[in-house]
């Protein structure tokens, strides 16, 4: 799941991936160690089974004599079969337990994918506008172009969303608006089966999506534009460090971001991939802040000033990182040492300058440099640096853009 946006996870060795999971604090250390132990045990057992049968098999033999020899091979000549089987069960059960916990299924059933009743439709009293939208969807070209399974998921997600919104006491107007927003989201992801599957297979994700859609039109539009963020609704618990120790949190985000940027920029320019990584990081952290703002995954919603603090800290991080990644290219062009710290400053005005940034705020920036009176190349150098930074921050890539930048002094 994370390999789609984080290139560090696109490696084959399982133990290397588990170490990355530990470094990124995706799982607690005890769980990572348990998975490492299980992997080593199961891999050793796999090798012994395959050597015994001389074929690529992963089935434990039923023959008790073979099992006894496997136990001795794993634990020594005095090992008992029962001890071997108990150890095997322990590792298998632990892996299954951690896998189940990873998605917080909480015993809820997955989406029913049976065809809807022919006459099913959103209740006209509760969802008048959604009903009109649904009737226009039925038999339309977009619906007909979907694969059968995707169409079944789409239809049943609409049915379940309508039932949940009607049953949870959401006021009629808010419920209708939320269902319309859900329709927008489903249309945006309808041809991307992985995203549909998240909502179909993990009821907690669907519940969190509906909470978001009810609470925020901007959040609904943001998720629809960036559906990869659905991953963050599988488990709604917001990282506590963000709220309790924000400075530590942003240092961790910066370290993770730099590792990813190093991977794509180590062997060449890699600026296009780097720009995408910056955008995905910004989308992710903005969305995590939004969830905390709305009270999704936290004990109580973030106060408004804390939301502004987080968004401003994120913008500062993106600006600093952009400068750090653009400057080496400028230094190389003008034959400076890339380790030279240039006499260059980014001054923030407006919302960011006052640490009052909102979700859709633009950035009011002024770029300043210092040079000797006779340094005639300085203007060219630092104008190019500012121009490239603005391009990194404002250009539209496959993952969108970062900010609108205003450099006019008023």
Residue ranges and their predicted role:
Residues 1-410:
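Non-catalytic regulatory/linker segments of enzymes
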């Amino acid at each position: 799941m994370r390999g789609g946006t984080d290139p560090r996870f696109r490696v084959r060795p399982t133990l290397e991936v588990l170490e990355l999971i530990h470094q990124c604090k995706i799982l607690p250390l005890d769980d990572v160690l348990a998975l490492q132990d299980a992997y080593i045990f199961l891999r050793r057992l796999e090798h012994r089974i395959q050597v015994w049968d001389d074929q690529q098999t992963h089935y434990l033999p039923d023959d008790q004599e073979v099992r006894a020899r496997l136990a001795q091979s794993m634990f020594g000549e005095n090992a008992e079969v029962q001890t071997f089987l108990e150890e095997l069960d322990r590792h298998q059960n632990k892996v299954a337990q951690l896998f189940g916990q990873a998605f917080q299924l909480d015993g809820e059933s997955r989406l029913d994918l049976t065809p809807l009743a022919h006459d099913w439709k959103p209740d006209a009293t509760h969802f008048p506008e959604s009903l009109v939208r649904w009737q226009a969807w039925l038999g339309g070209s977009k619906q007909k172009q979907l694969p059968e399974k995707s169409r079944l998921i789409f239809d049943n997600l609409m049915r379940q969303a309508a039932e949940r919104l009607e049953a949870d006491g959401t006021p009629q107007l808010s419920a209708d608006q939320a269902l319309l927003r859900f329709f927008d989201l489903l249309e945006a992801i309808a041809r991307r089966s992985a995203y549909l599957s998240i909502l179909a297979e993990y009821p907690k994700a669907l519940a969190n999506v509906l909470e978001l859609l009810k609470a925020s039109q901007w959040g609904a539009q943001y998720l629809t534009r960036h559906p990869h963020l659905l991953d963050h609704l599988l488990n709604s618990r917001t990282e506590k460090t963000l709220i309790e120790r924000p400075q530590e949190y942003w240092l961790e985000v910066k370290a993770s971001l730099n590792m990813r940027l190093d991977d794509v920029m180590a062997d060449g320019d890699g600026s296009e991939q780097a720009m995408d990584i910056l955008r995905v990081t910004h989308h992710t952290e903005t969305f995590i802040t939004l969830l905390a703002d709305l009270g999704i995954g936290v004990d109580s919603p973030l106060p408004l000033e804390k939301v502004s603090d987080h968004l401003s800290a994120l913008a500062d991080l993106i600006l600093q990182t952009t400068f750090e990644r653009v400057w080496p290219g400028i230094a190389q062009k003008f034959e400076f040492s890339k380790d030279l710290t240039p006499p260059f400053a980014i001054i923030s005005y407006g919302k960011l300058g006052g640490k009052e940034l909102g979700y859709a705020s633009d950035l009011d920036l002024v770029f300043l440099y210092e040079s000797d009176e006779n340094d005639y190349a300085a203007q060219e150098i630092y104008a190019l640096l500012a121009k490239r930074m603005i391009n990194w921050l404002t250009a539209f890539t496959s993952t969108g853009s970062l900010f609108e930048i205003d450099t006019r002094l008023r």
